[in-house]
Every structure is written in structure tokens, then in C-alpha cells.
Amino acid sequence: MNSTGNTIQTLEWFEHIRLNPEMYIGRIGDGSDVEDGIYTLLKGLIDSSADEFEMGYAKRLGIEISGLAVSLREYGRGIPLESVVNSTSGLSVGIGARKDVVTTNSYKVANALSEEFSFDSYRSVASSWALYSKGCLTDQRIEEDKNLEPDGIRVKFALDKELFPNSYYRLEIVKDILEQYSAKHEGFPISLNGY
């Protein structure tokens, strides 16, 4: 069979992730094992904040989890306001999953695998946010002189139940993961559901 322009299908960046989630987060599972993909994804997001802490920027991280819904609030420097969409969509060359952690594309992978995904960046008196549905950008905004939030980022997402039909985060597993991060990154305060 000869390949022609008519026989080659090009996928959007999020379609590839949604069709092949195991390439990015490992096995799907149901959330009953720390090796399940939902924890690989969560660790990738926490790694980003831990890196910011190690560089002297992130001061603390607050995480809230219920079922497949996650909210992370990192108190740090935020990302450049004009970079929010580029930081949360599209794929970088050479990405892929390692067994223990998602690469620097963790925000993008979470975005693609979620029913809804929002990303806010707060810097000084300005803020920027982007809202997505299953990887598709639905709204974005930069607001000058209206930010009352401390600098940093907020990521909220609800993983797509079609992709994770029997999964949910077990808080006891998340607590164990966070204890490992606290031991590895001494002095980095991480809270779970307000504690």
C-alpha cells in the first residue's frame, strides 16, 4: 500500500494523548495501586512545584483531591502570563512517560486527559488563565491590575471518566506519595485537603 496525503491522518496534540494515555502515564488501573497512571500524573505535577522549590521560588503547595478532581495551588513565582496557553497545550519534542514520573509536559497531559482543565498564573498585580475541555481551549484571558492572589499558579482538573471509568484517587496512597516528597524536599510544605 502506498502512502499518500489522503491516507495519512494527522492528530491534534491532545487526540494522540487521549488515544494512547498509557504512553504518557503508564497503566490506567483503577487507583488502587501507586503504580496506576493517575498517581504518575499527579507526581509529574508535584515534581514541577518541587523543582520550583529547589530553585528557591515555590514557598508551599496546597493540593485538594476528591474522586478524579484535583486542584493544586503553588505559591511561587507563577509563569509568564503570555505563556499560559503554550505551557498547557501542544507537545514538546521527545516527550513520553517514564515509569515513575511524567515529563515536563505534565500540565499538557493532565489537560488532554481531563473533562475540564484550568490553569491560572498570578504575577504581581496581573493574572492569566486558560480553560480547556478535553484538551480544546475554550477560553483564555490576561487581566492587568486585578489580581489579589499571591503569586504562583493554580491548576484544576477533573480526569475524564470515559478514559478512567473505574478510577479514583485513594487519599491514603496520595498521603504516602506526599510524605516521600516531604522527605526528599525538606522544608517544602505540602498540604492535602487543607491539612
Language model features: what each stretch is:
Residues 32-61, 107-113:
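Conserved ATP-binding N-box helix of the HATPase_c
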Residues 19, 23-26, 51, 55, ...:
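Conserved helix-loop functional segments at active or binding sites
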Residues 1-9, 67-85, 93-195:
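GHKL-type ATPase core
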Residues 1-10, 19, 27-34:
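C-terminal effector/catalytic modules and regulatory tails appended to multi-domain proteins
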Residues 13-14:
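Alpha-helix capping/hinge segments and adjacent helical runs
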Residues 63-65:
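Conserved catalytic core of two-component histidine kinases
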Residues 28-36, 95-97, 164:
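Flexible beta-alpha connector loops of hexameric P-loop NTPases
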Residues 26-27, 191:
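Short, hydrophobic secondary-structure boundary micro-motifs
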